[in-house]
Amino acid sequence: MAFSQKLSLRAYSFSFKKWKGKNPEQTLPLNAKVIFNRLQDGEERTYEYTSAFDLIVDFIGANMDVDDKEVRQQLFNCSFDSTNQGEKDTYRYLIFTVYAGYYGYASKLVNRKTKSTVHKKSRDEADVKPFYVVVVIPKDTEISKAQRGLILFQEIGIYGVKTVTTKAMQEFF
């Protein structure tokens, strides 16, 4: 019997908070205008988004090129096809792909059938794997403003991208 990698989704809720120093001041509505300052090219700039959804789309766009997270010896980037977003009566969603892999150690790839080495991986090569990420943001209702969304991370066996993705989001936001 062949062993197969366990494919799964792990779900998390998320919110955006306005911070004053080190303390969260308030939770922000996800479907309201978002304005914040961010350093870019050594200069502080003001960014305005119509909602958290658009902020996340901008995060994906800003991470299309491969980023070398040298401290963690990890490569990271995203891809997104605008056809992988949409909305239903009660929520909006988008699906994007995160590519991540570690480098920093040499190893070899061995063909399991022939038992022969097919490639010798150098310390500068990373085994980059694709993972799907799904973001769901509820729409506001007459009696309630959405303050929490849902984010689903695909996992393949022991591999996943939650930590590298959320750290990149924290750096971006």
Where are the predicted features?
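Generic detector of ordered, mature protein regions
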Residues: 107-109, 151, 164-166
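Intrinsically disordered, low-complexity polar/charged tails and linkers
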Residues: 1-140, 147, 155
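A generic structural motif
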Residues: 150, 154-161
